[in-house]
């Protein structure tokens, strides 16, 4: 069974929407381009004739959510919520594993660090149009990274590296990583955030 959470507020929202659809209509949760940097998650109506034998059904009180076989591992730990604030209401879908499959706790260090970068570090950098890529981990436990996008040439990259990325990764991989170093040849330009 997949670990997808649909909050009570989102369930109520879906139930209201589905009440206006033909009987037997449910929802489908999916990932387009799963496992890539271009991964995008979505929710759509799922009429009975669109259910495939390989789909996983996740039953809720007044509807079911169907997930296709390919999307399922990339929706691990996903959460769908319906948030209301003074600006209005909106459906939110958070899927930390959409761009990269969750790795096992006993996976090689390189895979675990890459996973942490893709799911924890890059979403924070994306707000500035930037990203970081793990190039290698040395025998001395130094993670070598390269910045791209808005981070390349940014005057704040040293602070981002030391106070953000390195601090987070050293805490998470205590005893395994000793440092994080930047291998980027920074080229300041219009693409740079600061």
From Swiss-Prot:
Record keyword Disulfide bond present: no
CC cofactor: [4Fe-4S] cluster
Binding site for [4Fe-4S] cluster: 151, 154
Alphabetized UniProt keyword annotations: 4Fe-4S, Iron, Iron-sulfur, Metal-binding
Alphabetical GO biological process terms: iron-sulfur cluster assembly; protein maturation
HAMAP family associated with the record: Fe_S_biogen_NfuA (MF_01637)
Oligomer status and interactors: Homodimer.
Name of the protein in question: Fe/S biogenesis protein NfuA
Underlying gene: nfuA
